[in-house]
Amino acid sequence: LRREYRIREEAPDKATNWGEQLWTLLASEVRLEVPTFIVDREAYDFVRTRLVNHLLSRLVVRAKQARAANAALPDETRAEAIRRAVDDVIALPEERQALISYLLTRIVDRIERRGATLTAVQKARVTGFARARRHRCYICGRRLFYGDDAVHDPDEEKEAFRSFELDHLFPQARGGGRGSDNLAACCESCNKYKDVNLSFADFPIEMSQSPSLNPVQVAKVFDGRIKFALLWRQGGACARCGKKFHDTADERLYLVRRDVDDAYHFTNVQVACGECEDGDMLDEGIKIRD
């Protein structure tokens, strides 16, 4: 998902991904195994990811709450409030607790100062870089409106939610920095679905299953939010040929099943590109985007 943008950064602490460091630390401690009686165990790895995401989000929100409640007090008192907040959520060896408290302090400090927000100069440079190369959405691959299109139609832009937005891959509100490796061109629609979620595992994907083969009925189950989760799970690339959706010739997408003998459910479906359909690489397919 990474698209690097060339920006000058004079404040490295604003670019550091403290959130990713915290996620990696928590993930190393979460040893949640998928039951051995499940045949396709790999398909359920999202359960562990969801737990890690939840713990990180809870810790960040709890730390922000603790800081806000002690905003007028000395720094040491506020630091102690964060340490107590960590102790309320998890119980790890002392040095691990201390490291988590340190990372949360850095994250909350930056959130309070809006430190991960790009400067006007940085944003203009990134936008210009993306516009010059006509970057499409890094998740769904749709063409973006940069406001300078020769046939720019404001009504279409508003209706299709295609406006260019700059996305922090790891959300600012969860500790993501403003470094060039954490930025990508995104459409308004995907950015709204993504919000402060950390991965597709944060969506209610268990509800997405249908016994029907009727395209209309299947489409009702796999609505916009779940289609977004599928695209995010695949890293913005076709499940069959591996090509990034933003590099395909057009914007067509098809919903296909991994196992055609199984029903349409989240762990059994994938999204394929129009080029795979044209190349007869799909045994079946429900078109979900023209």
Walk through the language-model features, giving the residues of each.
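Short, charged surface segments at domain edges that flank catalytic/cofactor-binding sites
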Residues: 98-151, 173-175, 206-237
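Glycine- and acidic-residue-rich phosphate-binding/metal-coordinating active-site segment common to enzymes
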Residues: 161-162, 169-189, 197-212
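Short cysteine-rich clusters marking metal-coordination/redox-active sites
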Residues: 137-141, 187-190, 238-241, 273-276
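Long, contiguous alpha-helical scaffold regions
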Residues: 225-290
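Mixed-charge, low-complexity interaction segments
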Residues: 1-135, 151, 161, 184
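Short Cys/His-centered divalent metal-binding micro-motifs
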Residues: 183-205, 269-290
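Short Fe-S-cluster ligation motifs
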Residues: 171-188, 215-228, 265-280
